Amino acid sequence: MSSAQCPALVCVMSRLRFWGPWPLLMWQLLWLLVKEAQPLEWVKDPLQLTSNPLGPPDSWSSHSSHFPRESPHAPTLPADPWDFDHLGPSASSEMPAPPQESTENLVPFLDTWDSAGEQPLEPEQFLASQQDLKDKLSPQERLPVSPKKLKKDPAQRWSLAEIIGITRQLSTPQSQKQTLQNEYSSTDTPYPGSLPPELRVKSDEPPGPSEQVGPSQFHLEPETQNPETLEDIQSSSLQQEAPAQLPQLLEEEPSSMQQEAPALPPESSMESLTLPNHEVSVQPPGEDQAYYHLPNITVKPADVEVTITSEPTNETESSQAQQETPIQFPEEVEPSATQQEAPIEPPVPPMEHELSISEQQQPVQPSESPREVESSPTQQETPGQPPEHHEVTVSPPGHHQTHHLASPSVSVKPPDVQLTIAAEPSAEVGTSLVHQEATTRLSGSGNDVEPPAIQHGGPPLLPESSEEAGPLAVQQETSFQSPEPINNENPSPTQQEAAAEHPQTAEEGESSLTHQEAPAQTPEFPNVVVAQPPEHSHLTQATVQPLDLGFTITPESKTEVELSPTMKETPTQPPKKVVPQLRVYQGVTNPTPGQDQAQHPVSPSVTVQLLDLGLTITPEPTTEVGHSTPPKRTIVSPKHPEVTLPHPDQVQTQHSHLTRATVQPLDLGFTITPKSMTEVEPSTALMTTAPPPGHPEVTLPPSDKGQAQHSHLTQATVQPLDLELTITTKPTTEVKPSPTTEETSTQPPDLGLAIIPEPTTETRHSTALEKTTAPRPDRVQTLHRSLTEVTGPPTELEPAQDSLVQSESYTQNKALTAPEEHKASTSTNICELCTCGDEMLSCIDLNPEQRLRQVPVPEPNTHNGTFTILNFQGNYISYIDGNVWKAYSWTEKLILRENNLTELHKDSFEGLLSLQYLDLSCNKIQSIERHTFEPLPFLKFINLSCNVITELSFGTFQAWHGMQFLHKLILNHNPLTTVEDPYLFKLPALKYLDMGTTLVPLTTLKNILMMTVELEKLILPSHMACCLCQFKNSIEAVCKTVKLHCNSACLTNTTHCPEEASVGNPEGAFMKVLQARKNYTSTELIVEPEEPSDSSGINLSGFGSEQLDTNDESDFISTLSYILPYFSAVNLDVKSLLLPFIKLPTTGNSLAKIQTVGQNRQRVKRVLMGPRSIQKRHFKEVGRQSIRREQGAQASVENAAEEKRLGSPAPREVEQPHTQQGPEKLAGNAVYTKPSFTQEHKAAVSVLKPFSKGAPSTSSPAKALPQVRDRWKDLTHAISILESAKARVTNTKTSKPIVHARKKYRFHKTRSHVTHRTPKVKKSPKVRKKSYLSRLMLANRLPFSAAKSLINSPSQGAFSSLGDLSPQENPFLEVSAPSEHFIENNNTKHTTARNAFEENDFMENTNMPEGTISENTNYNHPHEADSAGTAFNLGPTVKQTETKWEYNNVGTDLSPEPKSFNYPLLSSPGDQFEIQLTQQLQSLIPNNNVRRLIAHVIRTLKMDCSGAHVQVTCAKLISRTGHLMKLLSGQQEVKASKIEWDTDQWKIENYINESTEAQSEQKEKSLELKKEVPGYGYTDKLILALIVTGILTILIILFCLIVICCHRRSLQEDEEGFSRGIFRFLPWRGCSSRRESQDGLSSFGQPLWFKDMYKPLSATRINNHAWKLHKKSSNEDKILNRDPGDSEAPTEEEESEALP
């Protein structure tokens, strides 16, 4: 503003102050005047007064609507409830009166005031007086203030004029736009009618300012004119009045106050508002004129007065009170809400109510009052407090909206805010920021701004914003206050200054809330800008010029300004239009639903265009909110006041306009606005552009955005913008960028952060508004987008806010926007919020408001490099989403220390395939789900200390890969009492376990000692360690591998040891465990007590720079050989994929190894077939030679790009000799062809010998040659490694699996007890003899090897020694050779030959034969059945392992690291490629997990490793993957061997497996082995033999018993016969015997049992026997009856007869 304008403003303020008492009198005059015009209508329906928008263009139109322009004394308007609703806004309507006229009127007012010489009442006095007047006067009495009094009282006149103008504007918002200037003149007319002489005269006196004021007012009015706006204006006017008064008035009569307020406030509002408006208008007479349109905007302040006019006295009082007692704002705000409710009853109030529901939406709609009512029940209350707002409310609904923007009176109060809002809410806001800052500088000239701050008193802003439904109330209040401070500038410069400085900062600080409001007011700012040009002229004189342009366009811009303010308010008041026009501000800017919206777009074309630009910048106003943080530096308070004024939406808009300072900022913002808009995306830029740009962004969010803004404010104005974006689809999109923007506008965030607490509160409102506005945002968004660069920035800002928004605001934003968007936005600015560099993302030491609540997800292409270290220590992360790690696939170290994690799930770390270091200490983790660590196959370190873990349930450390690399685990400082996870004890590589400060029992220690055989250091709780120390000597004597380190505390501790009985007993379980460990492993275990001050954190000093996993070339070759077959299986060019990476792992060792490899190619061939000792010696020699050449070797990293190109001339030349010589030496053996190639290049490499050793070349050509040769050397070395690996693959196929298995046992200490078992050696002859059994065994092992080695990989051989290349040890024969070969061929030699052929063919074609694959697959099934549950068993174990892995997959949703990492987006070409690979490898790799891992690695190498920055990482991935496959294969073979030869041991080792399927398969496998393996079921057979023998024995015994029984019976019969001839048996007996012998049945020749057996069967014998008995009996008779002398003869005859 020019210095002339500033004095004018000062005069106006002083006069307003003087008119302090006048409001009491003037309101009566005004009331009488109104009564004359429409005594009944006015009383009954203030809207009717307002409804007569005869000249919507005229800022006084609303007034004239009440009092026809032609007859100033006839304020009667068509009895239109709608108009009446805008009667409150009618003040705003009047405000919108043409800037000239309103300026003139303002000038008269100022003059009158000055002439009166009266000084404004003190805030308390004024409030009291207004209150008394209100109480004494009825609404009718209040309303009819005579024009004379108005003349006398500039405040009253202003209010009347505003009321009249507003009425018109309300009646025809569009007309308002068209006739902004006309309104201005019309305003003069109605004023002349109402207060013709003085008012006009006074307008004439300061024509320049008046005109400016008029236009700016008019602009505000047009927006204010919107029905909704009008109601809002009414409520706002009430609020404005009520700031001080409303607390009382509203409390006394909240609803009636609304109606009365227009009448009562006229005086006070005219005083208060008029002063601000006049001041605004008058101060920038020149500028206002220059900003002719701005003056129109300024006129809005007049409109605000008009709003007051609706209840002028009350408003005036309240506004004065507001100004004086901004703290009362909150009270007023609440009453104002009631007021709004009252207006809601009329059509306009309903619209306001809607507004409150959807401020942003409402502004678009004509019914702004409802919007305001809803959005700003509080806002309106706040507006009620600010007379300006009240005036705005008075303006007719349509006009009121237009007026609202136009209604400078409202804007006047928060000129700064208006500035922010007015210019283009966006632009203005941004400008406003600058302007505010300028205003701050111009605090003298911009006392208005300061006074507004004072009016707000800093506190009022907050109350208002809170009532505004957040920030809006504050905004209105701020806006209103700004005007008053302008008015009060003269009366109480100190107060104004204090308020301006503090309030502005306070308002800024207070609010972000105000900030939000400011966005709403930003539209108003344009109007205010005109009014405030004086203030902001300094602040933004340059800006003001833009504002002038804007104002020139302002006529439209008025509407837009209103819209802009409305938009800003829209979030609060008229979301509809606001959203459409300014995204946020536009919506607000369009208080009149249709008109404003149209205007807003139009405004962009007219002043609105500038304003639109401004509006576009308005998003920056949103930024401005962010700026509001800066606003402290800048005159944020003005913005805030403006924002506060927008409280009613329209009022807010008016206030924005009213705020002259704001208007200037609007100009400035406007000027900046284009930039702001452009910069808006870079909210930071906005802030940089001029605080306004940034602020404008903030402003955009006023209602919703304001809230977002607020939260964002803290961060940067961005958030408000975000809200707006949220409303706007586009903003949402930008939201993602916004994080970056936010980071860009780090300053705003800081300011915002400071403000955030308030913004958070506002954010809530704004969130609601945003939601409500969301529909409008589409329209507004459209406009915004058109205007829109601002929109872009808002989005960016929003993301920034979100990212910063670790605050509630962020959460709300997130809720409003899609969570993904929110994340995206957060990630977008992640490098602004956090530190990005050196492959590290560090988000530590953030402010509490900025701390992360979720893992940030960076947008693609936001960071050129990769992050290998993520440090999120000290944030608020409480949950980890499933797919959050997709963007960090190369991360190796993750620190989540000191967050709020409570539980870990199986998908918590999906996607971190390369992770090695995981720090989860000092969280609140209570539970860990099964398979949680399964996605981390290469994890080495886990820190779970300082949590609340009470138990480790089964499967916590379960994973299909067995966690082969985990060697450090920290569990200390947990209330851990139970460890039920056997997988923990079985971790194969665990070397360090810290369980200090836990409650683990002695049983856990026993399990550790028994099963964790590789453990080297164990930290125990002090009580347990001290207990063991009491028996230190005994323990160390029993198990020499266990060492106890006891500290002094333990040695002196005499505490009773609960475990003493168990530990001290030599025959107890503990000692037996120690003995078993002694026999089981030779690894030395050190047991230590916990350290009292132990932080439990292990620092891996060399973690970031650790070398590749394989430090020996031979080891690298052996690991590489485990993955080469898979590359070949899928027809990939191995050289092109691996050559760029192969050199990397070995460059540290020395490229000179190439020579050794080449020279010893043949030797390697022999060594592979020879004993292991030879092999070891060979590789030791190779190592020594390579070490000698290390000094001369140059790193090949620099030549990585060249080496990648296999087609380079040097590589081709190198390859040709190889191709030629290979056939010669190997006679077509493809496997050795490549080795020969290496030899071919030996010469070339040897040429480099001197150079590599360090011998300098004397000639420059010689120097060049070494460089070229170095490249050749690197490439040759890589190729030689590939060939070596392939040769290893081929040679290992012929190796004997038996030896390999044996070696495996030797390698694994834990399996040492199995080392001595070599049954296969004995079994081999049998296998050869029995082809069937041999085929079965070989087939089983082959499938296993194929599955475990992942197809034809020499995994078994390589794994046997973890670095040895001996093919003998590698059972690759089984792996690569088709099963059919083993089955068909009984001869091992024949099989071997065929295998070799197969292998050669495989190497040649890089593909396994179909038959082989199918065979392997077929035979894998039996193995699967045999699998015993461990993941790494040979042969039968393979199946089991596969089964188990599959089961685990089910547990993890079948998503191993690769799957979860790669499959989220199936549409991705990489994902499609990986799926295809998985399908191709299915036949080769039955296990799903292993197959996915290999597919993912291949996909990564092919598609994600092209960048130079990931070369080393990719090389590490290749090495680790090969090493993992090697370990898995070795373990599988060991398991399989155990299953084959030790069933009991096999069962023990597999007790961990819970799977029912696995158990059933194990049983089936055991049965198969029993049937197929000779001797496997010997015990069973022995038992069967014994059983059979027993049965046979029993049968024999039974038979014998039967025979004996029969014999005894026969003997009995013989005895009976003898007894009968007892007296004469001797001779007969001898005859009988002789007869039996004659029959061939001699008693001596045959066994008695046999003879007796046949006796019963001889019928003849029976008959003979009977005959003999008869004969004997007859002979006896003869003997008895014969004579003694004849006795011998018969005897002899008988004997002779008997003998024959």
Swiss-Prot record:
Residues 1604-1700 are cytoplasmic. Residues 1-35 form the signal peptide. Glycans are attached at N296, N1079. Residues 238-249, 358-368, 482-493, 729-749 have a biased composition (Low complexity). The chain crosses the membrane at residues 1583-1603. LRR repeats lie at residues 137-160, 230-253, 267-290, 864-887, 888-911, 912-935, 937-959, 963-987, 1002-1027, 1124-1146. Residues 54-65, 169-189, 223-237, 307-326, 433-446 have a biased composition (Polar residues). Keywords: Glycoprotein, Leucine-rich repeat, Membrane, Repeat, Signal, Transmembrane, Transmembrane helix. It is a single-pass type I membrane protein. Residues 54-104, 130-156, 169-534, 559-580, 619-642, 729-752, 1182-1227, 1309-1328, 1675-1700 are annotated as: Disordered. Residues 1689-1700 have a biased composition (Acidic residues). Belongs to the LRRC37A family. PANTHER family: LEUCINE-RICH REPEAT-CONTAINING PROTEIN 37A (PTHR23045), LEUCINE-RICH REPEAT-CONTAINING PROTEIN 37A-RELATED (PTHR23045:SF19). This is Leucine-rich repeat-containing protein 37A2. It comes from Homo sapiens (Human).
